[in-house]
Amino acid sequence: MPVVGRDPNIPLVIAAGLLTLLISCFSLASLCKSENKYRDNEDLKVYFYQMFSVALSTYVVSSTHNSLKNKQGLPVMNQIISWMILVSSPVLLLLSPTFLFQRLFSILLSLMSIYLLLSTGYEALFPLVLFGLMFVWVNMEQEALQHYGLSRKPKLAFFNFTYAMDITQFRQLHLDDIRRSFFFVFFIVTAFFGTGNIASINSFDPASVYCFLTVFSPFMMGGLLLLKVAIPFVLVSCAFEAVQVTTQLSSKSLFLIVLVISDIMALYFFFLVKDYGSWLDIGTSISHYVLVMSLTIFMMVMNGLAQLLTTQRLGLPRRTKHHST
């Protein structure tokens, strides 16, 4: 895909928001038809709040860019709503149940509501496509385990992210775990370059933060742009955490394989570093090596964040039902 340009394409952002809401409706309909063991009315309210945030983000993006196009500036109400969505989305995420599909669905809605506010074109569709790919990956790994008779659980609906903390359910490493680790590294690189070469400063468009601020503030704008870059990484890391749970393998064991693959990549690019030729060739070879080394450290941070987002849940007081005698 080409680098995101400076000409905004808001209809694509609106289409991404509407597509997210459509997928959410189908997912909620499927959830309502599921067994009562995995459904709670209070949990459904959380999903409706998240869907409302996605719809609100879609409206704010459209309204803000129309206002800026008409030379009317950033509406104060849109700015307040944008910051409220940015703060409330992670909280709503942690209120959802920790069952595998329900938590992954909640992660998608929370991150999409933020990503839409930071999008100006086709990149708004990228998290949806990436999440669909992650969904297929998790199902594929579960089907592979069932084929070889290594999984004792027939349905992914039975998996809970909190099982990852139970050491009694861990198994030994297999050769297939190398494939899973390689896929994770491949998807991380895909998330890195999915919307263009983010190693280039030309890929960052200040128009992406116009829903939050229009006054030049380098630190604030830089932080928001880094958040936009990190969201696809979070999706991939959470999917990798789901793979670890479904395959009943310790997260540390599987992530050590990832680090070995990353070190091999870093060693390969280290031998490609040039100290001769044009300045462009020298700078490109050095930047490739630095990016791979930084990616290794960044994956460790993302792995810890994914464990937090998938296993933790904020408890709210539930209303008790009183029966009259």
Language model features with spans:
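Alpha-helical transmembrane segments of integral membrane proteins
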Residues: 1-325
